[in-house]
């Protein structure tokens, strides 16, 4: 009510009946009116009288839902975002202690206002059970059984950088927690707008029935127009009841619960429910997530309990209650399970691009994870052969997995890293984060050495130096491996002759020379499934094999003809002889392997999800370096420089055409400048496969991009696991990337 007189008592009438006595002050007055509910849109005539002032208006009163709102309090686990990684565990352990105390402090509250708490991540709970006294653990278990505290299944919040093995390792904590008699029926992922598809299958195996996804639309799109509950179907056909919730701190960002101001909370909540209803949210029940305070890694508080108690004293409905997430899910499943749609598809995450800011460590982590998988296969071979494994080997594997988990959890920067890119907290967070990648690399290498030592014990020593290659996969393998061979065995100037026991020499090619050793590439043939092959090493003269250097700019074998453009260091023609097919789109503005630097004119474009102020640039300079011919591949190498690379020779691209397989490798490296302004660079792959469709491997399976995924999930870029492909009815081109996962298709 806008009133411009002196303060005055006022009466408000509806359809002639007095419904409110109030006081009007000069200016804007907000007045809550209590009106009986209606079953259909109903016209209400309102009248206000305050002394000589009066006004009339008519409004249409619509039917309203008898809302039941459940408030789910949690602390978002963001390791290193609000303070150093070294502080976060102690904080979250303390929060569980506080949660127990707050349960005690609100035991005399009405049940719907009693303090309740959801432990968002299982990591702090797992550690809590290891370090707290038995009496405190008993308190925790008691409150869990009462439904006052809830334990969930996600170890951390993960995007798609971790592979299936890492995600499986993250769930070991659930087993330890359940061994204590603690139920884990729900997984909660917050602040990440996607999740590995394989987790759906994993959760089903663990008895986890529900998945709560607390979104965050900053620089990302959100799936679905409204909060949506659905049956998410896994690659194997299993189903998980899943809720795409609102922002994981809607209670703080929208409702301002942390202020404790009942009037502010009341107005914000009513406006939120009006908005939710206008979007055709179909149910009367809703869950709203919040933290004790408006921050990640927030301590719990009893503010919500006090607000809910005040609200319920004022209103019959909407009914508010504190709740665990599982209670909301179980109620919805009981009342509406047949109303939820079934959606089968991957859920790619928008925020994985953050790992592009730590490309070196991300690549190292991917290599470490795949190497650890191979090493575990080697340990299985050893155990199958009757070799006793070391007592500490499982602990070593757990420590390697732990490093992988801490690197791949979703936090990629300190909260002030954009404003203070070189500040002490930013640099500390960065250093600690990247240390996990190198720790994983180191621990994995040690496990590999231990594995080889065990397997070696089953083999006799040969008169001549020998090499044993193990295949830990369950199918026969041919392909490339590399090995360092000391000059004591193969002198400098000689070639490594690698012979099988039938006297057949394998194709080899030198890769790197040092004073004491040479690294050799070896092309292996038919190493048995879950088996091995043994080879003899002896020096042969260099002149027995071709290893020439030339300045030709064309590469050709029986499958492909590759024509390069020395002026740009790119490929202008990639001709498939078998199919008489040109593989490159000749009309594309970018050539195959072309370097593209993209720089933004302003950072705000990322927040507003637009791109209208940017510059794309090729390399500043590029030059031909060399061409080499070898037994395994022939290659052309170019060097270049860019504004984003160090000098000299900041960028390298090598094109390798293989002689033993229908395969082309394009290897790129950059000595990157440290730049804090928003930028990115790309390597172009403009393939021309007629009517081709894009496919990519995600954690959990292979999808057709844009089709086999939840609508609204990331499609500007994909986090490739091992490969992507373009295929039509007759042709398939497969791209593998061991280190770099981000591709735009």
Which sequence ranges carry the predicted segments?
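Surface-exposed loop and adjacent secondary-structure segments within mature catalytic domains
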Residues: 138-146, 196-260
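Active-site and substrate-binding clefts of carbohydrate-active enzymes
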Residues: 75-78, 226-456, 472, 501, ...
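Conserved short loop/turn motifs at secondary-structure junctions
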Residues: 121-126, 155-160, 184-195, 217-220, ...
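C-terminal (or distal) subdomains of carbohydrate-active enzymes
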Residues: 199-202, 218, 228, 253, ...
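Metal-dependent polysaccharide deacetylase catalytic core of the NodB/CE4 family, i.e.
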Residues: 73, 79, 110-190, 238-247
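CE4/NodB-like, metal-dependent polysaccharide N-deacetylase domain
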Residues: 167-205, 270-290
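Active-site beta->alpha N-cap acidic-glycine motif
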Residues: 30, 40-45, 52-135
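Extended acidic/polar, glycine-enriched regions
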Residues: 2-69, 515-566
């Amino acid at each position: 009510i806008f009133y411009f007189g002196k303060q005055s008592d006022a009466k408000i009438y509806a359809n002639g009946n007095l419904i409110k006595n109030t006081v009007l002050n000069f200016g804007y007055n907000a007045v809550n009116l209590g009106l009986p509910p209606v079953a259909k849109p109903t016209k209400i005539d309102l009248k206000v009288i305050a002394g000589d002032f009066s006004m009339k208006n008519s409004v249409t009163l619509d039917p309203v839902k008898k809302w039941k709102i459940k408030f789910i309090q949690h602390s978002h686990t963001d390791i290193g975002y609000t303070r150093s990684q070294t502080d976060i565990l102690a904080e979250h352990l303390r929060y569980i202690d506080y949660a127990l105390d707050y349960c005690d402090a609100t035991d005399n509250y009405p049940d719907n206002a009693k303090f309740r708490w959801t432990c968002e991540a299982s990591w702090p709970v797992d550690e809590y059970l290891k370090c707290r006294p038995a009496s405190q653990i008993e308190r925790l278990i008691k409150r869990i059984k009462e439904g006052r505290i809830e334990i969930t299944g996600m170890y951390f919040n993960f995007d798609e950088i971790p592979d299936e093995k890492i995600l499986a390792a993250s769930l070991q904590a659930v087993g330890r927690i359940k061994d204590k008699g603690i139920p884990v029926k729900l997984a909660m992922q917050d602040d990440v707008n996607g999740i590995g598809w394989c987790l759906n299958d994993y959760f089903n195996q663990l008895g986890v029935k529900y998945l709560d996804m607390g979104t965050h639309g900053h620089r990302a799109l959100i799936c679905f127009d409204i909060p949506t509950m659905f049956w998410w179907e896994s690659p194997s056909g299993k189903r998980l009841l899943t809720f795409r919730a609102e922002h994981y701190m809607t209670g703080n960002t929208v409702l301002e619960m942390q202020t404790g101001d009942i009037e502010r909370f009341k107005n914000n909540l009513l406006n939120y429910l009006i908005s939710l209803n206008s979007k055709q949210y179909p149910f009367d029940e809703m869950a709203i997530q919040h933290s004790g305070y408006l921050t990640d890694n927030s301590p719990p508080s009893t503010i919500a309990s006090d607000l809910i108690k005040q609200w319920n004293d004022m209103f019959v409905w909407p009914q508010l209650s504190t709740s665990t997430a599982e209670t909301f899910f179980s109620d919805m499943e009981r009342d509406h399970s047949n109303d939820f749609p079934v959606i089968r598809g991957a859920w790619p995450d928008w925020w994985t691009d953050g790992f592009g800011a730590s490309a070196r460590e991300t690549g190292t982590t991917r290599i470490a994870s795949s190497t650890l998988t191979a090493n575990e296969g080697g340990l299985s071979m050893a155990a199958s052969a009757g070799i006793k494994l070391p007592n500490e080997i499982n602990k070593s594997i757990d420590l390697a997995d732990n490093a992988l988990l801490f690197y791949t959890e979703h936090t990629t920067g300190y909260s002030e890293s954009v404003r203070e890119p070189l500040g002490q907290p930013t640099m500390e967070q960065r250093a600690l984060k990247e240390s996990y990648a190198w720790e994983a690399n180191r621990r994995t290498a040690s496990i590999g050495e231990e594995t080889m030592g065990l397997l070696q014990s089953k083999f006799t020593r040969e008169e001549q130096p020998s090499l044993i290659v193990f295949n830990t996969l369950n199918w026969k393998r041919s392909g490339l491996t590399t090995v360092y061979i000391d000059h004591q065995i193969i002198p400098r100037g000689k070639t490594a002759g690698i012979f099988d026991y039938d006297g057949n020499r394998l194709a080899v090619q030198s890769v790197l020379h040092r004073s004491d050793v040479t690294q050799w590439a070896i092309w292996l043939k038919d190493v048995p499934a879950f088996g091995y092959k043994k080879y003899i090493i002896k020096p042969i003269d260099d002149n027995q094999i071709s290893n020439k250097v030339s300045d030709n700019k064309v590469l050709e074998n029986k499958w492909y003809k590759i024509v390069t453009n020395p002026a740009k260091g790119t490929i202008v023609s990639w001709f498939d002889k078998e199919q008489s097919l040109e593989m490159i789109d000749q009309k594309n503005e970018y050539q195959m392997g072309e370097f593209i630097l993209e720089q933004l004119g302003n950072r705000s474009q990322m927040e507003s999800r637009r791109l209208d102020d940017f510059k794309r640039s090729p390399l500043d300079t590029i030059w031909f370096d060399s061409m080499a011919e070898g037994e395994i591949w022939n290659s052309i190498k170019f060097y270049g420089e860019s504004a984003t690379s160090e000098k000299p020779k900041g960028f390298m691209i090598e094109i390798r055409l293989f002689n033993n397989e229908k395969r082309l490798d394009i290897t790129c490296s950059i000595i990157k400048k440290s730049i804090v302004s928003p930028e990115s660079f790309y390597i172009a792959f403009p393939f021309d496969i007629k009517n081709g469709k894009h496919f990519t491997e995600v954690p959990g399976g292979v999808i057709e991009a844009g089709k086999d995924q939840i609508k609204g999930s990331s499609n500007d870029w994909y986090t490739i696991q091992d490969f992507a492909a373009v295929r039509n009815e007759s042709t398939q081109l497969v791209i593998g990337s061991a280190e770099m996962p981000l591709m735009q298709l």
